[in-house]
A protein has these predicted regions:
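Alpha-helix capping/helix-boundary segments
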Residues: 30, 51-53, 80, 157
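Residue-level signal for inorganic ion chemistry
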Residues: 20, 38, 46-49, 139, ...
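Active-site loops of AMP-binding adenylate-forming
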Residues: 60-61, 89, 93, 101-120, ...
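Conserved ATP-binding/catalytic segment of the ANL
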Residues: 125, 141-145, 149-197
């Protein structure tokens, strides 16, 4: 993921620096180069959009590349298709799905590998101290399975847009809920599903 995105910077890069882990950065997405880097550097975790992992799987070198070092692929930006989860699963690789924005620093929800197939298409549950709700056009909370705007509240929410008080006021309501503009729903267990971004 690009370093100018919250996922590329906070999810992997800063975390790796904090833990003293090696980090492999490539200038752009070239499926062959990514596969070669995974094999050469024994990559254990990788963050990307489903399309990135799809492009890698479609490359002729995919079937012959040693991916045995990879434990987890962290996916964001869109739901990950079951066929892609199954394809990588055949190689012993699990997926985690997340949802967030720069304004949510970085996660609003996260789905670990143990629930990846059971909650297919879900972006998971909010992290500790973070709440997610779905509202209608009148800012009224909706029930399970009802689609509406995804709103997030917690200490991870930005304080505001730099020198843009009007934009801040339209994004964060008087109760502190950040209005993402994204459409989704919660299931009966509180798992978030993204419908439109």
């Amino acid at each position: 993921a690009p370093l100018f995105h919250i996922g590329g910077l906070n999810v992997m890069t800063i975390s790796a620096f904090q833990m003293g882990s090696p980090l492999v950065l490539l200038r752009h997405l070239d499926p062959r180069a990514v596969l070669e880097a995974i094999a050469e550097h024994k990559v254990t975790h990788m963050f990307g959009a489903p399309a990135m992992f799809l492009f890698m799987s479609q490359h002729p070198a995919f079937s012959e590349t040693d991916l045995s070092s990879v434990d987890i692929l962290i996916v964001g930006a869109a739901p990950c298709p079951a066929s892609l989860i199954a394809l990588y699963g055949e190689r012993g690789i699990s997926f985690c799905q997340g949802y967030g924005l720069t304004e949510t620093s970085p996660f609003a929800s996260f789905l670990g590998p143990q629930k990846c197939l059971e909650k297919l298409g879900s972006a998971g549950l909010p992290p500790v101290h973070t709440d997610v709700r779905i509202v209608d056009a009148n800012n009224q909370p909706l029930g399970p399975q009802e689609r509406g705007e995804i709103c997030i509240k917690g200490p991870n929410i930005m304080k505001g847009y730099w020198n843009r008080p009007d934009a801040t006021a339209s994004a964060i309501d008087e109760l502190g809920w950040f209005h993402s503009g994204d459409v989704g729903y919660l299931d009966e267990e509180g798992y978030l599903y993204i419908c439109d971004r």
